[in-house]
Amino acid sequence: KIQVPSLGEIKFDISFGGSFFALVNAEQLGMKVDAHNADELVRVGLLIRDEINKTIEVVHPNNPSINRVDLVEIYDKPTNPEADLKNVVVFGMGQFDRSPCGTGTSAKLATLYAKGKIGINEEFIYESITGTTFKGRVLEERKVVNIKAIIHWQGFYHWFQPSSSRP
């Protein structure tokens, strides 16, 4: 946990799914992961990311040039009854992923597995801020330089139909 100016104490997990992610429960922020809150979710996500990078050192065990949290994944209860959780991933200079984020889903699967909340070959469905979903599973556990890691499989497809009522 860290202290973030204007937000207070924030609890989070750091996980790797291609980049380092900070995973933050939206409930502690008093927010919902919803497209109507996108601007505020981005603002808060960047504050959290920047404070983490000022106070916590992360380094990939095989690639020391990967040494910062690049993305903040804010997760929430799903609105889709088939999904397990819902998220928005904030990155860059204020962008967010409209999909559940492939690398973010990997990071979430690794965190859930490490906490004993999902087992080998159990399906996990992640809903995005726009309502799209990704499915993933932990296939096996491995070691990466003596650090527990997972191998996962993910399958997904997208259907987009633009309309004035959908962001």
Set out the residue ranges of the language-model regions.
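Active-site proximal loop and beta-alpha junction motif in alpha/beta enzyme cores
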Residues: K1-P167
